[in-house]
Curated annotation (Swiss-Prot):
Compartments where found: Secreted
Source organism of this protein record: Arabidopsis thaliana
Entry similarity comment: Belongs to the DEFL family.
GO biological process terms, semicolon-separated: defense response; defense response to fungus; killing of cells of another organism
GO cellular component: extracellular region
Coiled-coil spans in chain: none
The keyword Disulfide bond belongs to this UniProt entry's keyword annotation: yes
Extent of the signal sequence: 1-28
Record-given protein name: Putative defensin-like protein 191
Record-annotated disulphide pairs: C33-C79, C46-C65, C51-C74, C55-C76
Keywords: Antimicrobial, Disulfide bond, Fungicide, Plant defense, Secreted, Signal
Amino acid sequence: MAKSVNATGFITYMVIFLILTGISRVKAKKPPCLEGRTAYVSPGPCSNSLCTQDCRPAGYHTGKCKVEWSTPICKCYGCRKV
């Protein structure tokens, strides 16, 4: 009797593990995209919000502005939709 209880418990835990693993794999699927970044010289003032507004139409998630060698550079980051 003890062997059947242990076997039933093991099978139950194994089934639960496989179900949870399958659910996590389904949730992990993301739409196709290209991870990466691009950079361009910002024509206006250096502002992260303006960079984000410029990057969104190109499909990137966010933008950050940095001043490099006295030139405002806007860098787009995130997942670009394919």
